[in-house]
């Protein structure tokens, strides 16, 4: 048989405290303060509350308001109240009245200026003269140069004629155009006289039952086709 002997557990800290002698009560007090500090550290405190604790209370503020020659600061409080009263009774300047701003979105009453979109721009001395000057514009170095040129003869115009199955455009002046129209009128008159004579011959021979065949060449533009005239002006051919 085995025997187990139970020995009492001895607390080392108890012996250490007994060894310290009269300083044991100080150690117990330090233990209590450390426990209290740990509890405070664990408890959450809002930072604003911490700041409020650090601020001065009403009594300390009253003590800070002491002025020279006084100890309690009662007179300084009266002076501060008087200054505050004067500040409230001082008249204030009336606020400025802002002028109403004009509406910039209103339509403009002035009529818009009429612009002449003609190109090239009109020149007075060119407009006055009928056949003495003409306007010519050229492109030089990316710019348009308008020049007034003296012209001795009147400006030319186009005349259209049909001949040999083609349409012919001729540049001619006003004088040649008038003479050309006069010649056409004379040719039409002569053709009308020839037509009247042929109709009379047919009526006279109708009794003998002999009819002469009315032969007439195809005419274009009221007249027979003529060979191309040698015009001095420049001619343009148009294919149809």
Swiss-Prot record:
GO terms for biological process: regulation of meristem growth. InterPro entries: FAF, FAF_dom. Residues 117-171 form the FAF domain. Residues 207-216 have a biased composition (Basic residues). It comes from Arabidopsis thaliana (Mouse-ear cress). Regulates the size of the shoot meristem by modulating the CLV3-WUS feedback loop. Can repress WUS but is under negative control by CLV3. Residues 217-226 have a biased composition (Basic and acidic residues). Belongs to the fantastic four family. PANTHER family: FANTASTIC FOUR-LIKE PROTEIN (DUF3049), PROTEIN FANTASTIC FOUR 2. This is Protein FANTASTIC FOUR 2. Expressed in the shoot apex, stamens, carpels and young siliques. Detected in provascular and vascular tissue, and in the center of the vegetative and inflorescence meristems. Expressed in the funiculus. In roots and leaves, predominantly expressed in phloem. Residues 89-124, 177-229 are annotated as: Disordered. Residues 184-200 have a biased composition (Acidic residues).
């Amino acid at each position: 048989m085995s025997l187990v002997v139970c020995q009492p557990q001895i607390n080392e800290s108890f012996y250490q405290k007994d060894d310290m002698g009269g300083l044991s009560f100080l150690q117990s007090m330090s233990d209590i303060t450390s426990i209290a500090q740990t509890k405070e550290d664990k408890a959450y405190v809002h930072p604003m509350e911490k700041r409020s604790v650090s601020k001065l209370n009403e009594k300390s503020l009253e003590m800070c308001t002491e002025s020279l020659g006084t100890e309690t600061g009662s007179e300084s409080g009266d002076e501060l109240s008087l200054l505050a009263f004067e500040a409230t009774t001082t008249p204030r300047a009336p606020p400025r009245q802002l002028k109403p701003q004009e509406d910039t979105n209103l339509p403009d009453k002035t009529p818009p200026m009429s612009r002449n979109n003609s190109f090239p721009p009109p020149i007075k001395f060119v407009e006055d003269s009928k056949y003495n000057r003409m306007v010519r514009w050229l492109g030089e170095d990316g710019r348009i140069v308008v020049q007034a040129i003296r012209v001795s003869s009147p400006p030319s115009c186009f005349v259209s004629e049909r001949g040999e199955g083609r349409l012919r455009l001729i540049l001619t002046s006003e004088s040649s155009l008038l003479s050309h129209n006069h010649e056409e009128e004379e040719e039409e008159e002569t053709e009308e006289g020839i037509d009247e004579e042929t109709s009379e011959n047919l009526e006279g021979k109708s009794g003998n039952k002999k009819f002469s065949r009315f032969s007439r060449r195809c005419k274009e533009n009221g007249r027979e086709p003529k060979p191309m005239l040698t015009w001095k002006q420049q001619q343009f051919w148009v294919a149809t």
